[in-house]
């Protein structure tokens, strides 16, 4: 089939739009804790995450600090009083943190990685959001190192024939 035939076949779709698949975005699928209901899809070749990481992390730390400072209750406060004041604050903080994390990774990370609990829950001596970011950014680092090595090998192969 020639190029024109292929283009005609593609343009005969119901909406008349020609679909082009460049295959430049390769999302990888990760299963969390062996749970088939917790599949995370990430484009671990997305270098723009470097631009998003620092501002997102600063916002998350600021939210955690603000929530902690507002959780200072007097020693004589009743459990009901603490819960009444803390619940909406913590819920609102968690929603903001989840939105930031999802934007950072350009995926539904918060729901898949932390379906219950909150992003500021303590986990292994750090906030849950910190643990999630550490684990996921390591996936990006490993993939990007691998991709850059492939590029280096390809460039080396092509330049070798001209230098020897």
Cite the ranges covered by each PLM segment.
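Intrinsically disordered, low-complexity acidic Ser/Thr-rich regulatory segments
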Residues: 79-96
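Short N-terminal mixed-charge amphipathic segments
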Residues: 2-82
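Short acidic DE-rich linear segments
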Residues: 1-16, 150-164
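Extended, low-complexity, charge-balanced
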Residues: 19, 27, 96-102
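Short, flexible coil/linker elements and helix-boundary hinge sites characteristic
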Residues: 71-72, 88, 146, 160
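C-terminal charged interaction modules
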Residues: 99-164
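Charge-dense, low-complexity intrinsically disordered segments
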Residues: 47, 84-88, 123
């Amino acid at each position: 089939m020639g190029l024109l035939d292929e283009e005609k076949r593609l343009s005969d779709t119901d909406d008349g739009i020609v679909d082009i698949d460049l295959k430049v975005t390769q999302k990888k699928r990760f299963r969390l804790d062996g749970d088939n209901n917790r599949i995370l899809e990430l484009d671990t070749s997305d270098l723009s995450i470097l631009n998003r990481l620092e501002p997102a992390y600063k916002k998350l730390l600021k939210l955690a600090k603000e929530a902690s400072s507002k959780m200072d209750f007097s020693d004589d406060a009743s459990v009901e009083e603490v819960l009444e004041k803390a619940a909406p604050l913590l819920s609102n903080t968690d929603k903001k943190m989840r939105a930031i994390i999802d934007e950072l990774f350009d995926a539904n990370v918060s729901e898949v990685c932390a379906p219950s609990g909150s992003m500021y829950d303590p986990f292994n001596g750090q906030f849950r959001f910190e643990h999630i970011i550490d684990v996921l950014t390591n996936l990006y680092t490993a993939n990007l190192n691998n991709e850059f090595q492939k590029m280096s090998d390809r460039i080396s192969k092509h330049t070798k024939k001209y230098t020897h």
